[in-house]
Swiss-Prot record:
Interacts (via LXXIL motif) with PPARA. Interacts with PPARGC1A. Interaction with PPARA and PPARGC1A leads to the formation of a complex that modulates gene transcription. Interacts with MEF2C. The lineage of its organism: Eukaryota, Metazoa, Chordata, Craniata, Vertebrata. It comes from the Eukaryota. The gene is Lpin1. It catalyses: a 1,2-diacyl-sn-glycero-3-phosphate + H2O = a 1,2-diacyl-sn-glycerol + phosphate. The modification Phosphoserine is found at S106, S150, S285, S287, S293, S328, S392, S468, S472, S483, S634, S635, S921, S923. This is Phosphatidate phosphatase LPIN1. Residues 218-229, 273-284, 343-358, 404-413, 461-476 have a biased composition (Polar residues).
Length: 924
């Protein structure tokens, strides 16, 4: 019985440890990276697929992933998305590059964020001190006003109670409309916990695990039930949070909650959150990525997360935009009780000085969620909305009465409820627009460049085709933009507006106006009746906000349609020099859009969105019933007139956009100082309570002319697919006999090994440990990159074990690896598998059929071109030099062509002369 008890205990402990390794909440992994040195010395790499589990980065200090290679830190960093994926941030200044929404992101912050926050704090304190004593006592921290701290505390408590009652009533009414809204619950420790900007860490919080100064970390509330844990890049991820009830809350409750959007660092300050939403948005576990709730009552669909090789995770698209449009027409939508408002930043610098903070308070920034539903509206609805909104300039619109603002903006903001969370750094009164104008110019220059594209506006609010990725509505919230979820309308919104007209004027000295273009616009029916219209010399093609002739526009449109990306800027300029007509020796427009102007349309039908020249319907973007349009001017004189007169104000514009990428450039790879062969790499994320979460992998530096052997794992190294996952973890040797010796001898002949399996990325550490564990009398498997599927655990297991279709992943992965070896078109010399699907995958990437081997559970090895020849790993090991000839000749006396010139062919005796007796007799 003692033996039985010990055996049961050992099995229990083993299964428990196995569950810890497979628990989706703690599942982290890294796929090995392959770097290929090209003939010209440049480097190319496979994608950096790194994923952190939920518990490992539950309360991350920043969403910054540090990288160590061979024990030394490198100057490159990755950023962490809300699905746990890590990615690099690539800066681009191509104003015509089309960046999908799920690839847009904000830059990785440096010390500039801390400097800006300190500047904003100083401005806020100075403003509070200038107020009357009662207001100052209410806004200052308790440490500054000890005598009036209790009074301000009681007032804040009454505010929260009133806000709680409103939110509870709204929650009962709209519970079916938005299940992610949660009411605020008050804590019994409200009177003992200071609810302002001066937060302190609790005594039981362990110290940080690194040497980073604590002032760079966001402070943590001492409130035991509603502590806030800000996430990275000063971006507070969307969480179930309270929204100010703009129709029921008195004006004084809405004051001081104006959120300020800082374009280049996405710094956000949000309203106070509920206890249930006090944590930041954390990476989704593998089970959550697959097992989405299907009983949603809202129009939004929580779709399965697709994570393909070489790409970032994005939601599957199942519903068409037209169905969304028909299901919820804008005109028949009932105005809900709770509203979110979006603060629109005008490019005109005088707007900030003309607005008073009182008129702008109460406007919550419109922050996107991880899965955003875009509302499509037709032009008739837009006309009706535009007619209802009185035409007025931007500054006058901001001074409009508050209820009117709520009414005009609610119709389009209500479908996409946003979740905001208030910053703990700015006290009780938030941040004002004056904080931006009073900021130190040196600090402001880090975030608000003076020139560039109008990126601070939503994409649909402008007619131009330029994309400023870091300034999209999803980017300002950080979490939404890094969540990896692509909106179902991205396929429409990412394409630039294209229109054609017979207005002419490209070769004249006059400029092409929008009215003139629309006057001669060509409809679809006209173009269908007369396709030869493209030969008309007066034809003008409008791509975004730029005008071309057909000869110039044709390659641009072809590249966008075929490759979903624009031509390089140098190529476009070369085409324009050859094909575009000249205007008085000067180009007809400035390529970089330096002469872009902002025109405020006063017509009601143009207050909301443009129409008539867009080929597809675009989602309506309303901002205080004001439509700010960007049109391209074509003269330097207009550009000079459009410059703001005052240079002291800040311009929220930038022509630099940021996008996610999983690959590094050749220069970045060279900066890693990799050595030939394997290089250990560690990806780490610092957390406030769990310390540092690490994810280990290997970077392999190979040459373009190396020969690679592909090997499957499940069923090829192990004896079966299913038991190969379980039995080795329990300590049972479930490996084919002789495979370690065979692979070792093949590697000694100069071949590289690549282990490719359709297992999930979360099983990387377990699989890598198994490959290191295989040992046959002192002989181990050769080192090689481990390539796994970046998809979730359960989807990978379902594809590998249940569907038995691993070729879906393998073909995509191996094709990408093969392309890295160019100009070597056949880098894969041989391959080992166990199923017909493996044979199909290997044939697709160019492996010769006579060097594809499959093994069955009995250990019988079959060569595909001669299936009757049944062998084994042990027998193949005996003739390894014939099947896998030696590549490294330094220790060999054989000639390169061993079948023609070798020791045997040189020393063998010549054949005796042979005479054909029949021929001799016939001749006689």
């Amino acid at each position: 019985m003692n033996y039985v008890g010990q055996l049961a205990g050992q099995v229990f402990v083993t299964v428990k440890e196995l569950y810890k390794g497979l628990n989706p909440a703690t599942l982290s992994g890294c796929i090995d990276i392959i770097v290929i040195r090209q003939p010209n010395g440049s480097l190319q790499c496979s994608p950096f697929h790194v994923r952190f589990g939920k518990m490992g980065v539950l309360r991350s200090r920043e969403k910054v992933v540090d990288i160590e290679i061979n024990g030394e830190s490198v100057d490159l960093h990755m950023k962490l998305g809300d699905n746990g994926e890590a990615f690099f941030v690539q800066e681009t200044d191509n104003d015509q590059e089309i960046i999908p929404m799920y690839l847009a992101t904000s830059p990785i912050l440096s010390e500039g964020a801390a400097r800006m926050e300190s500047q904003l704090k100083r401005n806020s304190v100075d403003r509070i001190r200038c107020l009357d004593p009662t207001t100052a006592a209410q806004g200052l921290p308790p440490s500054d006003t000890p005598s009036t701290g209790s009074l301000g505390k009681k007032r804040r408590k009454r505010r929260r109670k009133a806000q709680l009652d409103n939110l509870k009533r709204d929650d009962n009414v709209n519970s079916s409309e938005d299940e992610d809204m949660f009411p605020i619950e008050m804590s019994s420790d409200e009177d003992t916990a200071p609810m302002d900007g001066s937060r302190t860490l609790p005594n039981d919080v362990p110290p940080f695990q690194d040497d980073i100064p604590k002032e760079n970390f966001p402070s943590i509330s001492t409130h035991p039930q509603s502590a806030s844990y800000p996430s990275s890049d000063r971006e507070w991820s969307p969480s179930p949070s309270s929204l100010v009830d703009c129709q029921r809350t008195p004006p004084h409750l809405a004051e001081g909650v104006l959120s300020s959007s800082c374009p280049l660092q996405s710094c956000h300050f949000h309203a106070s959150e509920s206890p249930s939403g006090s944590r930041p948005s954390t990476p989704k576990s593998d089970s959550e990525l697959v097992s989405k709730s299907a009983d949603r009552l809202t129009p939004k669909n929580n779709l399965e997360m697709l994570w393909l090789w070489g790409e970032l995770p994005q939601a599957a698209k199942s519903s068409s935009p037209h169905k969304m449009k028909e299901s919820s027409p804008l005109g028949s939508r009932k105005t809900p009780d709770k509203m979110n408002f979006q603060a629109i930043h005008s490019e005109s610098s005088d707007t900030f000085s003309d607005q008073s903070p009182t008129m702008a308070r109460g406007l919550l920034i419109h922050q996107s969620k991880a899965q955003t539903e875009m509302q499509f509206v037709n032009e008739e609805d837009l006309e009706s909305l535009g007619a209802a909104a009185p035409p007025s300039p931007v500054a006058e619109e901001l001074k409009a009465p508050y209820p009117n603002t709520a009414q005009s903006s609610s119709k389009t903001d209500s479908p996409s409820r946003k979740k905001d969370k208030r910053s703990r750094h700015l006290g009780a009164d938030g941040v004002y627009l004056d904080d931006l104008t009073d900021m130190d110019p040196e600090v402001a220059a880090l975030y608000f460049p003076k020139n560039g594209d109008p990126g601070g506006l939503p994409k649909q609010a402008s007619d131009n085709g330029a994309r400023s990725a870091n300034q999209s509505p999803q980017s300002v919230g950080g979490s939404g933009i890094d969540s990896g979820v692509e909106s179902t309308s991205d396929s429409l919104r990412d394409l630039p507006s294209i229109a054609i007209s017979l207005c002419g004027g490209l070769s004249d000295h006059r400029e092409i106006t929008k009215d003139a273009f629309l006057e001669q616009a060509v409809s679809y029916q006209q173009f269908a009746d007369n396709p030869a219209i493209i030969d008309d010399p007066n034809l003008v093609v409008k791509v975004g906000n730029k005008y071309y002739n057909w000869t110039t526009a044709a390659p641009l449109l072809l590249a966008m349609q075929a490759f979903q990306k624009p031509l390089p800027k140098a190529t476009v300029e070369s085409i324009m020099r050859d094909k575009m007509p000249k205007k008085g020796g000067r180009w007809w427009f400035s390529w970089r859009g330096r002469n872009a102007t902002i025109k405020e349309e006063s017509k009601p039908e143009q207050c909301l969105t443009g129409k008539g020249h867009n080929t597809g319907e675009q989602p309506a973007q309303l901002g205080l019933a004001t439509r700010i349009k960007h049109e391209s001017s074509s003269s330097d004189e207009e550009h000079a007139a459009a410059k703001p007169s005052g240079s002291s104000h800040l311009s929220l514009l930038s022509n630099v956009s940021y996008k996610k990428t999983l690959r590094l450039t050749s220069e970045q790879l060279k900066s890693l100082k990799l050595k030939n062969g394997p290089n250990d790499v560690v990806f780490s994320v610092t957390t406030q309570y769990q310390g540092t979460c690490r994810c280990e992998g290997t970077i392999y530096l190979w040459n373009w002319d190396d020969k690679v052997i592909i090997s499957d794992i499940d069923g090829t190294i192990t004896r079966s697919d299913t038991l190969g996952h379980i039995l080795p973890t329990l300590g049972k040797d479930w490996t084919h006999q002789g495979i370690a010796k065979l692979y070792h001898k093949v590697s000694q002949n100069g071949y590289k090994f690549l282990y490719c399996s359709a297992r999930a990325i979360g099983m990387a550490d377990m699989t890598r440990g198994y490959l290191h564990w295989v040992n046959e009398r002192g002989t181990v498997l050769p080192q090689g990159p481990l390539l796994l599927s970046p998809s979730s655990l359960f989807s990978a297991l379902h594809r590998e074990v249940i569907e038995k279709k691993p070729e879906k992943f393998k073909v995509q992965c191996l094709t990408d690896i093969k392309n890295l070896f160019f100009p070597n078109t056949e880098p894969f010399y041989a391959a080992f598998g166990n199923r017909p699907a493996d044979v199909y995958s290997y044939k697709q990437v160019g492996v010769s059929l006579n060097r594809i081997f499959t093994v069955n559970p009995k250990g019988e090895l079959v060569q595909e071109h001669a299936k009757t020849n049944i062998s084994s790993y042990v027998r193949l090991c005996e003739v390894v030099d014939h099947v896998f000839p030696l590549l490294k000749r330094s220790h060999s006396c054989d000639f390169p062509c061993s079948d023609t010139f070798s020791n045997f062919t040189f020393w063998r005796e010549p054949l005796p002369p042979f005479e054909n007796q029949d021929m001799h007799s016939a001749s006689a």
